[in-house]
Amino acid sequence: MSGLAASWSLKPLGPHGVTQALCAVLLAVLVTMNVVLGDTLLDIPSQSPPLNQYLHCYRCLLETEELGCLLGSDTCLTPLGSTCVTLHIKNSSGFNVMVSDCRNKEQMVDCSYTRASPVFGFWIFYQCCFLDFCNNPKNRKNTMH
């Protein structure tokens, strides 16, 4: 064999050969990413967006007044002009489960809205507020109407 095919071999690589192979793979990945993604890699901002442009809300996927947050306690961010929301699912026997989250401007139609739930005997009541963490358990009674 002569030429390029003769230089390729299936024998085990030594430490130097492994390093060369890893460098070749890394170079191939970088070149492929540059070709596929173009300049988008350079467009990524080096800093996170300023947090003062967002409303910070309390998020809990399942909460009761007696036990607190049972599932998914977290914080969510939504652009200014949006709202924090707590959704109450209630019935006449005093059952009350809450879900807290962020709502964008398009979803604010639900604010201060009560409707029957798909389950007979229960209703859903939305409460919205517009200050940082206004829907967390400590602030909810003072800031949500």
UniProtKB/Swiss-Prot annotation:
Tissues expressed in: Expression restricted to the caput of epididymis. Detected only from day 24 postnatum.
Subunit structure: Forms oligomers.
Localization in the cell: Secreted
Protein name: Lymphocyte antigen 6 complex locus protein G5c
InterPro entries named in the record: LY6_UPA_recep-like, LY6G5C
Record's function text: May have a role in hematopoietic cell differentiation.
Lineage of the organism: Eukaryota, Metazoa, Chordata, Craniata, Vertebrata
Post-translational modification: N-glycosylated.
